[in-house]
Amino acid sequence: MEIFPAIDLKEGRCVRLYQGEFSKETVMNEDPVAQAIIFEKFGAKRLHIVDLDGAVAGESLNLSVIERICKAVRIPVQVGGGIRSLVAVEKLFSVGVDKVILGTAALYDKTFLEEAVLLYKEKIIVGIDAKNGFVATRGWLDVSEISYIDLAKQMENIGVQTIVFTDISKDGTLAGPNIGQLELLQKSVAIRLIASGGVASIQDVKKLNDMNIYGVIIGKALYEKTIDLEEVLEVTKLC
């Protein structure tokens, strides 16, 4: 199983939100580059970065920070948030990003998504963020009428190889991942799944590993030290 330490960017800082609420923000590190270096130092093999400002604005607003992170670490970095054109995708790849995560565009601009997948194949990941089972977009501010399962099936048909699935109600809560929704997703599509939201303990990670989930994104649990990065990397290596 792949472990993805998370860095959420807002106004150039590393923050955590509670259930996706921008008003419920906690600054975890004023220097996201330093945080990325810390994660790499403790053994991280890859990083997950979200441009929260970009997700709302519809364009990358923390590109310079992302570029500095990519230059500061030697591990692959995947980035999501506000990426809604091929130009934006290419710009991220040009500054050193390894994989790009598309969210809102996956729902509302299938032509762009298809072109991106055709050009970059497995380098394009789709982020599906669900609120009460329905897909949320534009920084989780809008909730659509399409279920996360239906969107996942559409993504599979387009050729997407990896999905990041987030249950918004779990995000930043340390309440444990939504196992039921992940199990249903596994039964519905044969795409690699990266679980995000609510992971609070080594036991949560082991449970996801036992389900053969491809990867897990860990944010708040690392910052609040309910999960030790070195320990979870060792545990998943042995599983």
Swiss-Prot record:
SUPFAM superfamilies linked to this entry: Ribulose-phoshate binding barrel (SSF51366)
Iron-sulfur in keyword set: no
Keyword set includes Cell membrane: no
Gene3D superfamilies for the chain: Aldolase class I
Signal peptide span: none
Pfam families in the record: His_biosynth (PF00977)
Cystine pairings recorded for this chain: none
GO molecular function: 1-(5-phosphoribosyl)-5-[(5-phosphoribosylamino)methylideneamino]imidazole-4-carboxamide isomerase activity
Catalytic activities: 1-(5-phospho-beta-D-ribosyl)-5-[(5-phospho-beta-D-ribosylamino)methylideneamino]imidazole-4-carboxamide = 5-[(5-phospho-1-deoxy-D-ribulos-1-ylimino)methylamino]-1-(5-phospho-beta-D-ribosyl)imidazole-4-carboxamide
UniProt record, GO biological process: L-histidine biosynthetic process; L-tryptophan biosynthetic process
Leading EC class: isomerase
Active site feature: D8, D129
Annotated compartments: Cytoplasm
Keyword terms, alphabetized: Amino-acid biosynthesis, Cytoplasm, Histidine biosynthesis, Isomerase
UniProt xrefs under NCBIfam families: 1-(5-phosphoribosyl)-5-[(5-phosphoribosylamino)methylideneamino]imidazole-4-carboxamide isomerase
Family: Belongs to the HisA/HisF family.
Protein name: 1-(5-phosphoribosyl)-5-[(5-phosphoribosylamino)methylideneamino] imidazole-4-carboxamide isomerase
Species assigned in the record: Bacillus thuringiensis (strain Al Hakam)
Lineage: Bacteria, Bacillati, Bacillota, Bacilli, Bacillales
Primary gene name: hisA
